[in-house]
Amino acid sequence: MNYLVMISFALLLVIGVESVRDGYFVEPDNCLVYCMPSPEICDRGCKRYGATSGFCKEFSKGENFCWCKGLR
């Protein structure tokens, strides 16, 4: 059991615990941001909030919203 704890701790040190999130970004009133009229809106908006990139993703039938990769 001691070895399991030591190995787990060593993995955390090697891998690191810093992580990023993916998800939809919202306007200040908590509304999802539509991709239309231009998908470039997503990339610019996501990068403004610290993401690595953004693109259109289908949320539900026929509705596309901005999806951000690597949000901090």
Swiss-Prot record:
Read off the SUPFAM superfamilies from this record: Scorpion toxin-like
> According to the UniProt record, which cysteines are disulfide-bonded?
C35-C56, C42-C66, C46-C68
Q: Which residues form the propeptide?
A: 72
User: What is the reported tissue distribution?
Assistant: Expressed by the venom gland.
Q: Where is the signal peptide?
A: 1-19
Database matches in PROSITE patterns = LCN_CSAB
Q: What is known of its domains?
A: Has the structural arrangement of an alpha-helix connected to antiparallel beta-sheets by disulfide bonds (CS-alpha/beta).
Q: What is this protein called?
A: Probable neurotoxin pcD-996
| Organism listed in the record | Androctonus australis (Sahara scorpion)
What broad taxonomic lineage does this protein's source fall under?
A: Eukaryota, Metazoa, Ecdysozoa, Arthropoda, Chelicerata
